[in-house]
Amino acid sequence: MAKKPKSVKDTNNMVVASNRKARHNYSILETYEAGVALVGTEVKSLRDGTASLADAFATVDDGEIWLRNLHIPEYHHGSWTNHAPRRNRKLLMHRREIDNLVGKIRDGNLTLVPLSLYFTGGKVKVELALARGKQAHDKRQDMARRDAQREVTRELGRRVKGMTN
């Protein structure tokens, strides 16, 4: 059986983009997986590994979830049929999930933030988070907690090294 050449990328389980600032600016309550309705040149551009979730967010309009401000650059081999880089893209979820999300968003002053964009079995998926925005003092508390944890880990490492020497 012939093997694939090593130069060919396996895009079946590839993370295309991740929103690293989302975990800093929001406290994540729940995560969901949704499909993304795309056109052909968008998928080809994503297979090149170029996309930006930096300013992206999701909204609910007329019972449908839309991903806004996701930047997928134009496909470099595309012609006049190329897509608009920042167009609104429909997210594909079950009706029960959408209704559940709408209720939670309205009740708890929450928002939908995309965390990552990836391929699963040839299909493009987005990991959405139901999140609440952090204020400045929340961010400072998180930083202090991480610093304290880092100090504990460092001290434990020193003690273990001291015992083995």
From Swiss-Prot:
Residues 135-158 have a biased composition (Basic and acidic residues). GO terms for molecular function: RNA binding. One of its GO terms (biological process) is trans-translation. It is found in: Cytoplasm. Coiled coil: none annotated. PROSITE patterns: SSRP. One of its GO terms (cellular component) is cytosol. Pfam families: SmpB. Its main location: cytoplasm. Keywords: Cytoplasm, RNA-binding. Residues 135-165 are annotated as: Disordered. Belongs to the SmpB family. Required for rescue of stalled ribosomes mediated by trans-translation. Binds to transfer-messenger RNA (tmRNA), required for stable association of tmRNA with ribosomes. tmRNA and SmpB together mimic tRNA shape, replacing the anticodon stem-loop with SmpB. tmRNA is encoded by the ssrA gene; the 2 termini fold to resemble tRNA(Ala) and it encodes a 'tag peptide', a short internal open reading frame. During trans-translation Ala-aminoacylated tmRNA acts like a tRNA, entering the A-site of stalled ribosomes, displacing the stalled mRNA. This is SsrA-binding protein. It comes from Mycolicibacterium gilvum (strain PYR-GCK) (Mycobacterium gilvum (strain PYR-GCK)). The lineage of its organism: Bacteria, Bacillati, Actinomycetota, Actinomycetes, Mycobacteriales.
